[in-house]
């Protein structure tokens, strides 16, 4: 019985990766219908341009406010996804914070770094949503931006907001269980952002905290799998296709 969550997680992971691969193969098939182009020339120039635009987000910084917000969300999401390595390891093996014993104090730094970026992403997403739906900047209310483009953009923002919120909620319940010296929750990590939420959960029983921590953990990783496969249907697929 103790292995059931591991089995369920592994099945979920395999299905998510399979479905993503299936969609990517469809996309590849459609791309290959086009005429082949030789792009082996100017390799250095092409690599520099890719790094500048895809990683450096040079096109976005032409507009200072939206540029900074884009960089925060983009860089933050890439950095945040590093924690997926540990979550996947924990999910398959049934461990908890599997990397903590090997990284020592550096692990505390990494988790605090993730939390700060999660907070910045939440702030940036709220500002993005307000600019699009409350302030209604001119470029967002053009006819071509109505319908699916608007809905898609908002869905991406909701995804990011919910994923980062679940990440912080997972951490705050985890840290409270660490404070209670629960044997299954290793004392590891530094939580500068989620610790602000401790008063909300501090009155709950140990059993309730364990249930909530597991709910938030499963919601976070399941949401990531759903988001990964939603990208195929979104204009934000360029997040992946911006790289060679």
Give each language-model segment a name:
Residues 1-244:
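Membrane-embedded alpha-helical bundles of multi-pass integral membrane proteins
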């Amino acid at each position: 019985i103790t292995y059931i969550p591991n089995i369920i997680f592994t099945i979920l992971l395999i299905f998510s990766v399979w479905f993503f691969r299936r969609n990517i193969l469809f996309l590849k098939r459609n791309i290959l219908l086009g005429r082949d182009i030789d792009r082996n020339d100017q390799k250095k120039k092409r690599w520099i341009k890719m790094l500048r635009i895809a990683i450096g987000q040079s096109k976005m910084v032409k507009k200072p406010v939206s540029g900074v917000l884009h960089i925060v969300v983009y860089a933050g999401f890439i950095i945040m996804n590093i924690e997926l390595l540990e979550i996947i390891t924990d999910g398959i093996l049934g461990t908890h914070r599997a990397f903590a014993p090997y990284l020592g104090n550096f692990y505390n730094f990494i988790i605090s770094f993730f939390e700060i970026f999660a907070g910045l992403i939440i702030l940036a997403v709220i500002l993005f949503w307000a600019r699009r739906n409350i302030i209604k900047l001119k470029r967002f209310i053009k006819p071509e931006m109505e319908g699916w483009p608007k809905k898609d953009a908002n869905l991406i923002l909701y995804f990011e907001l919910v994923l980062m919120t679940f990440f912080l909620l997972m951490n705050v319940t985890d840290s409270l269980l660490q404070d209670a010296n629960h044997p299954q929750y290793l004392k590891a990590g530094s939580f500068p952002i989620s610790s602000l939420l401790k008063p909300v959960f501090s009155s709950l029983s140990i059993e309730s905290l364990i249930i909530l921590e597991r709910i938030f953990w499963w919601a976070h990783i399941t949401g990531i799998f759903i988001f990964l496969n939603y990208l195929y249907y979104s204009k934000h697929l360029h997040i992946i296709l911006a790289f060679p």
